[in-house]
């Protein structure tokens, strides 16, 4: 068996080819070293000592337990346990449901997560910042500050109940575009369908990713990568012009300053020089306006950044352009991803 590092590096190298389809992934789950690495990754994280629906925690870990788990994976008798549902308070005072998987399921999910991250990290767009290595809400804000200069309108996107409404069939279809291993796909589907236990009652799951599941964030990014790529193509079609034309007022003031400056260089009379300097400073104050025409219809741009299920679009264009963009995104999300853009919470604001 190859070391986990070599396995993951190999997957990462292949991911750089956008049309590559991964095969024989399921065999990676026979590698005990992958599970040991997974164990090391999750053992110190808060919450992993919390018992799942099977009552076990990571302190009961052993190589024998890993071998038993691999055996169940080999003959595909492995079945994830339903997560134990609990509730945690949100900032607004409401409660958010959280599923606590069994530890064996955490272990398998962590192996899958490492594999998916290696396969997709290079494939993701630079505009995606949530749940990714070396990225955070801070890198998203930095990108907004850097790229959204001169933006006139903002479209703040809100997807209704995103994590609960991820369509399983759509997600599996997206995964199959890059993964040609049916057993690996079946395993992920098992996690999607595992359900949860609340008040000792089992509930099936028909949509959404495993709540509290280790693979949920990466699956969410794979799902919304479709939106990221759609917006990249949309911007390429929308963007117009090389640069904005100069503001006529700014140009006129600049001309006056140049003319007065030329006179100043030729004048030796101190009184006249002082008058010219005063006039130049006065015009310089008037010239504290945008140097370009902000209403230039021949120059348009879109900038887009996403963090998890929140996204923002900066528009250099008209309000009508922003409304069209919002409507196009709404239709794309519904038609392609079976998601609903919140009319109430998706705002268009002036910059």
Residue positions per predicted region:
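Non-catalytic terminal/accessory segments
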Residues: 1-351
